[in-house]
């Protein structure tokens, strides 16, 4: 035998002290007998590896109390054989005790019966499952947090999986589960190695975990939760830090010749974070495990390799035969290749691992029959017994056991559960007061975490109710969906995401019933439990997942472990089911927007520094639900998206789903610049599969936040910023009403003052013009690609929206004047000086229909002059998500519009008949009365000041205007004529550089032009999707003002002005 080598070494000291069962040997030479007809090699291999696992061996030695089941007690059988390993001097020991216990435990299922061959991987899993039941029988295997449970503290991997569709933004509910073995297909593993070799990458040992993850998720595509037709990969996140990780290799009978390739690809070190999509436990982020055991299969026979820690040598166990292989892993590889041994289970352990804590462990051995009778006495009803009444006392006296049982009844809580832990059945729980007190003592740490979770959940529910009261329109359906998810106890959809077949089928292992037929008896393997049964078995009151105890309140799902449930008894009877809810997925915290925003805050600190004053106060989803901000060290379910968002600037919008992906991808590729990437690529809400681009929310990756000069939120508040971000690509034409100017000559004179003042700004910022020009060129490229995507809205649709918007808000006119004046005054005080634009920059500007200009973003000279929206000339600008360059475009192009519009004789309005197709959801219905002749177009309130306006007071030219300089420009039509001449020159210059046949909608991605007859009256409207971040009164005042409309009186001048604008745009490009 191998131990003889120790005796023969002249330089070793083991010759004097070594004995076959001493502490020095740790029984490396003791084998397990497998007599003919027993077919116990699968069990012998599993037992040998468990004995060689230092963490398991020390933990089992430290645990003294358990629930004993007599002949069916696997815990007793293991302790017995481990004691024999330690003290016996026999070369081989019988494994009859544990074989009988295993057969007795699964007698009703006809598994692991005497004389029948079975699977070593299943045997290993079921041994761990039975150990859990012997230590903590009152706890669900998936929710066990007992510190003394070896199975879940050392072996179990607490995971959750989820799918997120990048096309439509929909996401599946997070599904938590527990794995004891992570199964990998050997075929997929070899394919991944081949792909790596094709990329000319060297297979390094530290990349082994990544290879396993790639092989585990290869071809594992699921359908989109919203049925958009996309195939998406599932992501699995590890929430705890197991000290022993078991990898199961699944061999296909058709590819059994891959033995050599698989063995050569194995590594002796496993980097735990690389095995999963993400790990949330801090201890798991740098956890590196060592290979200490391996079970192999060949020709209907099992054997094992184990690393002996004392001698640092690999030992080969083949039933009763034990042989040392050497200190090098190469020796094991050579043995496997030579004997054609197929690796079946790989055991990776933490070299610094320790035994389990015995703080909440049982102190005495309690027999199952007494434990069962104690349950009946407490009124739980007759349980389904785990073993028939002929169970033996195993040498313990009846009176002694009754005393211990009496004490045990007051020490632990009871569970009326099903007979088979692996059958997946659950039974009600009823706890007495004393038992409830014991549970509090056992799970103090879990209780603290539960209180935090409860507080966070309570605040989230209150915020959700507020958002529900505020919400109208299309978001009402979203609230219903969220609340339905809150009340649902079964997370997965019909497609399940856990409805997997048997993960490991060994066709070459003839061992009775096929494993696929027995898959329903397994509950510990992820592949053996379908989502329906898993979702129904997630709840045990007072308990949480192991990973949950180490994570914060952002994990996103609860297990009813709040303190009040313990105070009330934590019972799960029929009377309290309505009060104590089960696991509830909180998918609000999993939305793409909020996670993407948080990840950008952490990953792009230079952007944060540049826009401290301009950061949006909240994203769309955060304003709707008001969830707490995620901790930078968040370990919850939200983390599943963080890497996704680092690699890709937001998920694609639903345009791709609607058949517009090709054009959209092309435009997104052309607009990678810092000012345009977010305009054509949107991030939808994480749980909402929206088909409307107009309601997508912005993220911190948008250029409005990247800019360094934009100052947002001067006086508008969160509602303004939120509304502007969510109303994207809504573009309408600009109207300038000459009649209104004639009725208010004073306001017109003041506007002329503003024009002269604004003419100087380009002198102060010539570099801004260059930047804007290049930016507009990029926009034109996007427009040329996308101007064919959206058909124009029908006149009926526009007329209908015009009627409802007009009647909805015409009663608010007196208040609007005051509010507009207030915002203008605040913004004027914020800037503190008038601004000026150089007239020479007119030729380089155009009307940018993609940008937003609102009362708060008007030049400061207009606001200081006291010009109100009702008393001055009105302009209507399309709404767009705010960018810094958008501010500059607005401020510069407004001057051109007024120059082309204000003719000295008639001051007519240029008509730009561009219509936006509104989202398909119907608008809010109001009584449709006859529309008055005089209406107003609502100005979109903005909350920023343009970068171009932030000039130095010392550099202002001599044409600077102050509020007192207004009367000096009375009767200045000659100035207007001079400006018109300049505009004509601009027109001629543009005609030489750009064909006049080009229309404005070539620069407008989402627009299409329609020709309107002179006698046809169509109201130009903007569709506002209702947001939860504002009340109806707020929206009535600031977001949908009825517009002032006059029938077209001079078609010649309108066409003239339109042609001017088109040609100026042509000169820019």
From Swiss-Prot:
UniProt main location, coarse: other
Bias (Basic and acidic residues) ranges: 598-620, 805-826
Transmembrane segments: none
Active-site residues annotated for this sequence: 41 (nucleophile), 301 (proton acceptor)
Tissue expression summary: Expressed in the cochlea. Isoform 1 expression levels are 10-fold higher than isoform 2 expression levels. Expressed in the liver.
Function, as annotated: Deubiquitinase that mediates 'Lys-63'-linked deubiquitination of tight junction proteins, such as MARVELD2 and LSR, and which is involved in the survival of auditory hair cells and hearing. Specifically cleaves 'Lys-63'-linked polyubiquitin chains composed of at least 3 ubiquitin molecules, while it is not able to deubiquitinate substrates with shorter ubiquitin chains: recognizes ubiquitin chain in position S2 and catalyzes en bloc cleavage of polyubiquitin chains from substrate proteins.
Binding partners and assembly: Interacts (via the C-terminal region) with the heterodimer TJP1:TJP2.
Official protein name in the record: Ubiquitin carboxyl-terminal hydrolase 53
């Amino acid at each position: 035998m191998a131990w003889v080598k120790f005796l023969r070494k002249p330089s070793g000291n083991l010759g004097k002290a070594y004995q076959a069962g001493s502490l020095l040997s740790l029984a490396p030479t003791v084998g397990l007998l497998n007599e003919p007809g027993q077919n116990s090699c699968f069990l012998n291999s599993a037992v040998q590896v468990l004995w060689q696992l230092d963490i398991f061996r020390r933990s089992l030695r430290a645990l003294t109390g358990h629930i004993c089941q007599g002949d069916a007690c696997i815990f007793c059988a293991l302790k017995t054989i481990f004691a024999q390993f330690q003290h016996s001097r026999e070369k081989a020991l019988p494994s009859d005790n544990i074989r009988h216990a295993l057969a007795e435990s699964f007698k009703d299922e006809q598994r692991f019966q005497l004389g029948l061959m079975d699977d070593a991987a299943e045997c290993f899993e079921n041994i761990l499952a039975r150990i859990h039941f012997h230590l903590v029988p009152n706890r669900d295997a998936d929710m066990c947090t007992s510190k003394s449970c070896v199975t879940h503290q050392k072996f179990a991997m607490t995971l959750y999986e989820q799918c997120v569709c990048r096309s439509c933004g929909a996401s599946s509910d997070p599904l938590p589960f527990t794995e004891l073995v992570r199964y990998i297909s050997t075929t997929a593993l070899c394919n991944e190695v081949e792909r790596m070799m094709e990329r000319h990458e060297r297979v390094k040992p530290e990349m082994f975990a990544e290879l396993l993850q790639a092989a585990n998720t290869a071809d594992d595509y699921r359908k989109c939760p919203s049925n958009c037709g996309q195939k998406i990969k599932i992501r699995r996140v590890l929430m705890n830090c197991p000290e022993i990780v078991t990898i199961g290799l699944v061999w296909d009978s058709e590819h059994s010749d891959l033995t050599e390739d698989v063995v050569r690809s194995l590594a002796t070190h496993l980097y735990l974070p690389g095995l999963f999509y993400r790990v949330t436990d801090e201890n798991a982020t740098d956890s590196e495990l060592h290979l200490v055991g391996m079970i192999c299969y060949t020709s209907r026979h099992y054997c094992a390799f184990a690393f002996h820690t004392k001698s640092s040598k690999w030992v080969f166990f083949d039933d009763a035969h034990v042989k040392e292989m050497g200190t090098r892993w190469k020796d094991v590889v050579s043995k496997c290749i030579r004997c054609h041994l197929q690796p079946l289970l790989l055991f990776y352990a933490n070299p610094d691992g320790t035994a389990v804590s015995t703080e909440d462990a049982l102190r005495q051995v309690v027999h199952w029959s007494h434990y069962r009778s104690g349950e009946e006495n407490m009124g739980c009803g007759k349980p389904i017994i785990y073993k028939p009444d002929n169970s033996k006392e195993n040498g313990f006296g009846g009176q002694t056991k009754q005393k211990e049982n009496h004490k045990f009844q007051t020490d632990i809580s009871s569970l009326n559960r099903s007979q088979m832990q692996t059958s997946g059945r659950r039974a009600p729980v009823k706890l007495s007061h004393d038992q409830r007190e014991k549970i509090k003592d056992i799970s103090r740490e879990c209780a603290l975490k539960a209180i935090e979770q409860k507080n966070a959940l309570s605040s989230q529910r209150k915020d959700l109710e507020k958002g529900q009261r505020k919400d109208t329109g299309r978001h009402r359906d979203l609230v219903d969906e969220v609340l339905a998810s809150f009340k649902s106890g079964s997370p997965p959809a019909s497609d399940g995401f856990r409805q997997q077949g048997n993960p490991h089928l060994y066709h070459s292992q003839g061992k009775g019933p096929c494993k696929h037929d027995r898959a329903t008896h397994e509950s510990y393997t992820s592949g053996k439990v379908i989502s329906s049964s898993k979702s129904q078995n997630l709840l045990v009151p007072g308990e949480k997942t192991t990973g949950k105890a180490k994570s914060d309140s952002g994990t996103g799902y609860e297990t009813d472990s709040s303190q009040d449930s313990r105070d009330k008894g934590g019972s799960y009877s029929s009377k309290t089911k309505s009060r104590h809810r089960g696991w509830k997925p909180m998918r609000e915290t999993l939305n793409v927007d909020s996670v993407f925003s948080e990840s950008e805050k952490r990953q792009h600190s230079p952007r944060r520094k540049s826009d401290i004053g301009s950061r949006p106060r909240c994203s769309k989803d955060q304003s709707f639900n008001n969830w707490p901000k995620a901790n930078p060290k968040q370990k919850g379910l939200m983390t599943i998206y963080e890497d996704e968002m680092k690699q890709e600037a937001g998920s694609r919008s639903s345009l791709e789903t609607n058949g517009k992906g090709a054009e959209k991808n092309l435009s997104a590729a052309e607009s990678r610049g810092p000012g345009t990437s977010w305009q054509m690529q949107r991030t939808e809400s994480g749980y909402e599969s929206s088909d409307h681009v107009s309601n997508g929310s912005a993220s911190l990756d948008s250029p409005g936040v990247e800019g360094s000069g934009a100052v947002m939120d001067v006086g508008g508040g969160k509602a303004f910023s939120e509304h502007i971000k969510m109303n994207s690509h809504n573009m309408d034409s600009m109207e300038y009403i000459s009649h209104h100017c004639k009725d208010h000559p004073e306001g017109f004179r003041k506007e002329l003052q503003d024009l002269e003042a604004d003419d100087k700004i380009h002198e102060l910022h010539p570099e801004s013009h260059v930047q804007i020009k290049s930016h507009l060129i990029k926009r034109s490229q996007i427009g040329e690609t996308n101007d064919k995507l959206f058909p124009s809205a029908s006149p009926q649709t526009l007329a209908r929206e015009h009627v409802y918007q007009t009647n909805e808000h015409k009663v608010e006119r007196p208040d609007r004047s005051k509010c507009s004046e207030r915002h203008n005054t605040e913004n004027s005080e914020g800037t503190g000086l008038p601004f000026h634009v150089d007239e020479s920059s007119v030729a380089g500007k155009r009307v940018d229909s993609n940008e937003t200009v609102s009362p708060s973003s008007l030049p400061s000279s207009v606001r200081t002059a006291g010009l109100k929206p009702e008393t001055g000339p009105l302009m209507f600008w399309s709404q767009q998500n705010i960018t810094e360059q958008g501010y500059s475009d607005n401020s510069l192009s407004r001057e051109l519009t007024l120059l082309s519009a204000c003719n000295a004789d008639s001051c007519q309005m240029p008509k730009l008949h561009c219509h936006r197709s509104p989202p398909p959801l119907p608008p809010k219905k109001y009584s449709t009365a006859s529309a008055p002749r005089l209406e107003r177009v609502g100005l979109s309130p903005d909350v920023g000041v343009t970068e171009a306006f932030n000039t130095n007071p010392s550099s202002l030219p001599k044409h600077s205007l102050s509020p007192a300089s207004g009367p000096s420009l009375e009767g200045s039509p000659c100035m207007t004529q001079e400006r018109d001449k300049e505009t004509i020159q601009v027109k001629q210059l543009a005609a030489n550089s750009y064909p006049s046949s080009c229309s404005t909608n070539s620069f407008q991605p989402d627009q299409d032009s329609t020709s309107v007859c002179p006698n046809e009256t169509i109201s130009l409207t903007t569709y506002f999707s209702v947001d939860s971040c504002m009340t109806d009164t707020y929206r009535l005042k600031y977001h949908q003002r009825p517009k002032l409309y006059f029938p077209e009186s001079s078609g010649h001048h309108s066409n003239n002005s339109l042609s001017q604008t088109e040609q100026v745009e042509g000169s820019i490009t």
